Regions:
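Flexible inter-domain linker/hinge segments
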Residues: 28, 43-44, 164, 170-224, ...
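Proline-centered loop/turn at the N-terminus of a beta-strand
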Residues: 150, 224, 297-299
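Flexible gly/pro-rich beta->alpha loop and the following alpha-helix that scaffold active-site loops
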Residues: 233-300
Length: 302
């Protein structure tokens, strides 16, 4: 089940089995390493962004070649673009950055929130091609190329943001300007990503203990908790691991398996899509309901 096509080692796209991550090396597993000598060709030339309501925005293509299509959303952060791009919560969406300059400090090891770029496309005012930071290992465009994710820049992101605020949910597509008619046809038949089981796409398949035998400063064992993965970010797991022995769990884990790990509480992450989707999001809700019924302490984050 692949979302963005194939990519180099370290940038495995699509559905991932994080259970293969060696727990002591967990922090290193977030490093976005890529081989610049084998990157797919960068998209270039005139592009166009089409909205389902008839909106039309011209720009310039970057990132990977191909169409970006999905639900148009925006984020207002001035920094943290690498964290946003690798946040599973954006799976299936076209992510617009309202801050006009994206990529000025490059891409860095240990700053990603997962092992993939999850948006299906990226919209920016300007994507930096010459980041200014000594620790940068690449550009935003190279990150998108490595994951097969297209981007479009030199568009009026202020106007796009105002439109999304007025319309709410809106589907869109962008790609080469000369393929506008083809994109219009694709847009007519496009369905909402809410219909897809996005939690299944971004979550792990098997449970894994991240920090077995973890102790506090006095050498006492840390409490053991389960972390229900509905699209959890690495930084959440890192911080939980400082305070607990963490069992990273798939969203459809059953209570018997959970109880077998001897957890003392259950944590539920946020994630993409509709929590009412009849897939793994519903499985996670059932797991939480069973945990509450068994009087197991439950906590979450949004």
């Amino acid at each position: 089940m692949s979302m963005h096509g194939s990519g180099p080692s370290g940038f495995a796209p699509g559905r991932l089995n994080h259970g293969v991550v060696d727990a002591p090396q967990f922090a290193d597993a977030a490093d976005p390493l890529f081989d610049k000598s084998s990157l797919p060709r960068k998209a270039s030339g005139d592009g166009i962004l089409l909205l389902a309501d008839g909106g039309r925005f011209e720009g310039t293509l970057f990132g990977a070649e191909g169409f970006g299509e999905g639900e148009l959303v925006f984020t207002t952060g001035m920094m943290g673009y690498q964290e946003s791009l690798t946040d599973p919560s954006w799976a299936g969406q076209i992510l617009t950055f309202t801050y006009p300059l994206i990529g000025n400090y490059g891409i860095h090891g240990g700053k990603s929130e997962s092992r993939a770029v999850w948006p299906k496309g990226v919209v920016v005012r300007h994507a930096m091609t010459d980041p200014d930071h000594r620790d940068s290992i690449g550009t935003v465009s190279e990150l998108l190329q490595a994951h097969g994710v297209p981007g479009i820049e030199n568009v009026d992101t202020r106007a796009i943001t105002r439109r999304v605020r007025e319309l709410g949910t809106v589907l869109c597509i962008f790609g080469p300007k000369e393929k506008e008619q083809e994109m219009l046809k694709r847009l007519e038949s496009m369905t909402s990503p809410e219909l897809d089981d996005l939690v299944d796409l971004v979550s792990i398949d098997e449970p894994v203990v991240l920090n077995p035998g973890a102790t506090d400063d006095l050498g006492q064992p840390l409490p053991r908790i389960g972390a229900l993965d509905c699209g959890v970010k690495y930084n959440i797991l890192r911080n939980l691991s400082k305070r607990f022995e963490v069992v990273w769990c798939p969203p459809d884990i059953d209570m018997d398996t959970l109880n077998g790990f001897g957890i003392q509480a259950l944590f539920c992450s946020n994630g993409p899509g509709d929590p009412a989707h009849p897939g793994k999001a519903t499985s996670a809700r059932h797991t939480l309901a069973n945990a509450v019924a068994s009087e197991l302490p439950v906590m979450g984050i949004c």
